[in-house]
Amino acid sequence: MIAERLKKVGPSLTLAIDAKAKQMIKDGVDLVGFGVGEPDFNTPENIKEAGINAIKANKTRYTPASGIPELKAAVAEKFKKENGLEYKPSDIIISCGAKHSLYNIFMAILNPGNEVIIFSPYWVSYAEQVKIADGVPVFVQLDEPRNFEIDFNLLEKKITKKTKAMIVNSPSNPTGAVPSADSLKKLADIALKHKLLIVSDEIYEKLIYNGKKHISIASFSKEVKAQTIVVNGVSKTYAMTGWRIGYLASDNKEIVSAIDNLQSHSTSNPATMTQVAAIEALKTPDSVVQAMASEFDKRRQLIMKRLDGIPGLTYVEPEGAFYIFPNFSSFTGKTIKGRKIKGSLDLAEMLLNEAKVAVVPGIAFGSDNHFRLSYATSMANIDKGLDRIAEALK
């Protein structure tokens, strides 16, 4: 009964674990959740007011499928001001979240058998979306001892005549890694050499620490920009995950037109009032965003300090987003709380059932020796949860 293309697609473990954790809390379990990939802050008041006012002004009807012109213009201005990228409103598609933008891209650019380079560890939906579009994910393992740096020799070996695109995610979910300008430039050069499209997921661009700055790979040259599709959105930066507004930009009119056509036959336009709210979001002072980023940085420092105190766990310092990706391989093969730890699913199940802590198993991101912790939660929760993890792993 089910289409073959969906039989090879697994469910989102991150959403599944978050749903289970929320149900346990609803059932009265004293649970600490590190699974959710969304800010725990409220949407800023000015943005909420813009959405409310849009509804009161009856901004409740269809818009063009690719988004309202005013929001496209605001996105184009954002790219120019913040990323040094010149796009026309006609180069931009507004979608129902950055995840939707990515889905649209793969559906638009992939033919059966086309390969897509995905750096591993990777965000859970990249590989599944590529498979839905009848593409083939090709994984390139990042070098953990070198802070999840790219192995360019390995990358070159993975590129074939079937390779159509590569995905660049900076800052990274799940590792928090931020590739250097030199690494991004090398990636851009390789993409030009092999005539590959670059899908650049920049959704966490404003959540960067240690004084580092975000660089869009599309900004290196006109040639690189011409082969890059930039994806972003308002969800993570402005605590608007439920508003469902993402966007993409590309110089390639054929790709943009194809995505516009696809979206017109699937979701049509994103919700009208949330598009209006997104315009206000893009006008929000940087000080508001920086206040949230500063709080995330404090939590990042705390979670690293607490992990430092748990023997057997190691990690690479995250420089962006709000995740950390501890390596627990020293526990593999051991029995903890009556459960043999063969991989990350075993560890996550043990922590959930015995310690009442929800984490995301690393296998969801292509790395079975790790688990992901989101520090988009309170300092008190971080301390409470790490107390429980430390006790469980004694």
Q: Where do the model's predicted regions map?
A:
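Conserved N-terminal alpha-helix of the aminotransferase class I/II PLP-enzyme fold
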Residues: 62-95
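Generic structural signal for well-ordered alpha-helical scaffold segments
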Residues: 22, 76, 80, 106-107
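PLP-dependent class I/II
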Residues: 2, 6, 10-12, 17, ...
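Glycine-rich phosphate-binding segment of PLP-dependent enzymes
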Residues: 43-62, 76, 81
